[in-house]
Amino acid sequence: MAVIQQLDDALSNKIAAGEVVERPASIVKELVENAIDANSSQILVEIEEGGLSSIRIVDNGTGIEPNELELAFSRHATSKIKTDRDLFTICTLGFRGEALPSIASVSRVNMQTSTGSAGMQVELEGGKIVHKQPSEARKGTTIVVTDLFYNTPARLKYLKTVLTEAGHVSEVMNRMALAYPHIRFHYVSDGKTVLKTAGNGDLRQVIAQVYGRKTAEKMVPITGSSLDYELRGYIAKPELTRANRQYMSIFINGRYIRNFKLAKAIQQGFHTKLPIGRFPIAVLKLEMDPTLIDVNVHPAKLEVRLSKEEALSEMIAESIKKALSEETLIPEPKKENTAKTKSEQLSFSLAYELQPEKEHVRETMQQPRQLAADDQVDRKKESTSIGNSWSPSHQQEEEVEQGRGSNASIPPRNERVETNTEEKYEQADRRTDESLPMEMEEEAAVVEPQLPLGNDAEAKGAMPPLYPVGQMHGTYIVAQNEQGMYLIDQHAAQERIKYEHFHQKLAEPLGQTQELLVPITLELTTRETLVVTESKEKLEAVGVFLEEFGKNTFVVRSHPTWFPQGDEESTIREMVEQLLDNKRISIGELREEAAIMMSCKAAIKANRHLRTDEMFQLLETLRRCQEPYTCPHGRPVVIHFSTYELEKMFKRVM
């Protein structure tokens, strides 16, 4: 008997199914991709018991010719490619010809399809055709998959609960809807509609369906292009983050992919705007020449190889930075959720079945503007239509405050409110560039060397002028302008100022140094000594020059004049620890970490009471920062309470 044997098709398909058909969500993904490749404009997906019992997919695509239906369930039979050249210019989602035979080998399948002239129906069990007959000529395909893994019980026992499997299917459908907003998707689980999109091509509307209306409202459009790539999509403002990367969706030529470097590029675009351990929400759609991407890496087609990956990552990061720089990123306080009424649900035009007249609500005043002569604030703004229904996963986020009816009557602002705030601070404005008294410099200087204020300082995205009126608990500055009240975290504010100051100094060639009367002596461990010896050039690039002074001992005889005073030794030690944690850290990354660390040490601390002119100087310097809205660790610097919200809190408007 021969030792090496040719496996039969049934066994080969089961082996292939181990990679292609992981769980019910894998089947939904493959079959929906087939429907998309068939130029469908409407796709219905119905599952029962998380897809374990039944999966039904109906589309209105081109269908399959009756005489080719049986061939479609053969291994490596496909209409997508014909030659080797086609393999490197793939423009479809499917191309391997493995999905249908793999699915059929581990389940019972019933498919009915037609190109519009004649229809055919076929039934399979365990990959074998058991029945075949003509059917109606409705153009499109209906496929029903039941009893998944009925003939491979070992695979069945490794599946999770019904709710978990249904969640995976929902994730697949959400990605498909985001990738193809021009297709009308209808996803039903156990008889309940989970997702239903309009298919009108409005990506923001689909985001509202998937992530919720409030999330969609905080999404910022993004565009970018180069000779090889075209980028468009939406990113959430930094105030809206998640605990993992699952909310970053990257699509290349309509295909959802996972790529660590591109995900990292998204995070780099939010540089210092995200809190540690938090991740942004992003929906990015990339278009490129198919020759620049290799999708033939894994049967699941989630992993791809990219040409010019570094250039693409840089373009993504820069496009995100540009989009965020054009937005006002001052977060507003979170509103309490209250019970919503049916009329309030309908007042926001999320429905595409029901399109009510656009209501006028108050203008969200985030940009500086002059008040009218009669001192009234126009708070009307057309609400944006961005979706219709919501899934159970985010239904709780859809709460709307009671009392906000359409066309609410908003009285003029009380005359006692000071309107010309700038007059009060004319003298303080003239003192902006003056230094603080010496005793304050010793304690924790509030004022930094003035950062250059760009020509676009008053453009969209720039921080508006703020006028301090007091301080709370020696920690928060209370300020105002025509748009309302602001709370500023004074430590975070100066941390941002110091960070940009140190970051600028670290990037410059080493300038003046300060000789120390008493050199700093560092006693290190053997491991630390080895790391310092290997990374001496990196330390010198950030202004730290170490001389050997015996076994495992180094001395520092000078340091740059801009080093944080009084914290020189601890600063140098922390730089050594960073090298110890990451020996491969680049000079740029070390400069970045050093700037963050030094800014935190040098910034003014809480419980530090400031005079009004000191607060004014701090706020003016903050305005000159390139990124004034977050500290280097991503925490917010400023919280905005609009005049409308304050009046609403005091029941002056309803």
UniProtKB/Swiss-Prot annotation:
Keywords: DNA damage, DNA repair. Residues 413-434 have a biased composition (Basic and acidic residues). One of its GO terms (cellular component) is mismatch repair complex. The keyword Mitochondrion does not apply. GO terms for biological process: mismatch repair. SUPFAM superfamilies: ATPase domain of HSP90 chaperone/DNA topoisomerase II/histidine kinase, DNA mismatch repair protein MutL, Ribosomal protein S5 domain 2-like. Residues 384-394 have a biased composition (Polar residues). Residues 358-437 are annotated as: Disordered. InterPro entries: DNA_mismatch_repair_CS, DNA_mismatch_repair_MutL, DNA_mismatch_S5_2-like, HATPase_C_sf, MutL/Mlh/PMS, MutL/Mlh/Pms-like, MutL_C, MutL_C_dimsub. GO terms for molecular function: ATP binding; ATP hydrolysis activity; ATP-dependent DNA damage sensor activity; mismatched DNA binding. Coiled coil: none annotated. This protein is involved in the repair of mismatches in DNA. It is required for dam-dependent methyl-directed DNA mismatch repair. May act as a 'molecular matchmaker', a protein that promotes the formation of a stable complex between two or more DNA-binding proteins in an ATP-dependent manner without itself being part of a final effector complex. Belongs to the DNA mismatch repair MutL/HexB family. This is DNA mismatch repair protein MutL.
